Amino acid sequence: MAAAAELRLLEKSLGLKPGNKYSAQGERQIPVLQTNNGPSLMGLSTIATHLVKQASKEHLLGSTAEEKAMVQQWLEFRVTRVDGHSSKEDTQTLLKDLNSYLEDKVYLAGHNITLADILLYYGLHRFIVDLTVQEKEKYLNVSRWFCHIQHYPDIRQHLSSIVFIKNRLYANSH
């Protein structure tokens, strides 16, 4: 999914009126937001953070200094590890690392949903939708987290709902 489409989903989930003008710049198609009253903003994380502040939902950026740093860390992870990596090996490594991290966590940063969860959900959707049942079981913690995030009101929107089986079908899947 193109960054502009993700940013429009984020706008809607934040309750912002549509109408921002997005474009893409350079070979890597880095998103750019044309602002009315200032310079253009560039980069998925920068624009998403701006939208959260515009919607007065700063709690999505973390409530403590540590949570804010963790949200930024996961936004960086999203841009550096998820975007532009489409090989099967890259995807498997990414999901394995994320699965280990989520072993004892409900959210990526802290005890509530944050912008990091939302943007990582949008970024991973294209990979998760193609996983087999066995692969979803292999990455059980990612599957649990993803299923939880997709059921938040206004997050999934028009993206396809991904079905996760509650009872394990395969033994020793990880």
Swiss-Prot record:
Region N-terminal: start-end pairs: 2-56
Region span, Linker: 57-63
Positions of the GST C-terminal domain: 50-173
CDD domains xref list: GST_C_AIMP3
Chain intervals for the UniProt region annotation (C-terminal): 64-152
PROSITE patterns (alphabetical): GST_CTER (PS50405)
Top-level taxon in the UniProt lineage: Eukaryota
One GO term of the biological process aspect: positive regulation of cellular senescence
Coiled coil stretches, renumbered: 153-169
Pfam family, one: Arc1p_N_like
Induction of expression: By DNA damaging agents, such as UV, adriamycin, actinomycin D and cisplatin.
Modification N6-acetyllysine, positions: K138
Protein location: Cytoplasm; Nucleus
Designated name of the protein: Eukaryotic translation elongation factor 1 epsilon-1
Organism of origin: Mus musculus
Lineage: Eukaryota, Metazoa, Chordata, Craniata, Vertebrata
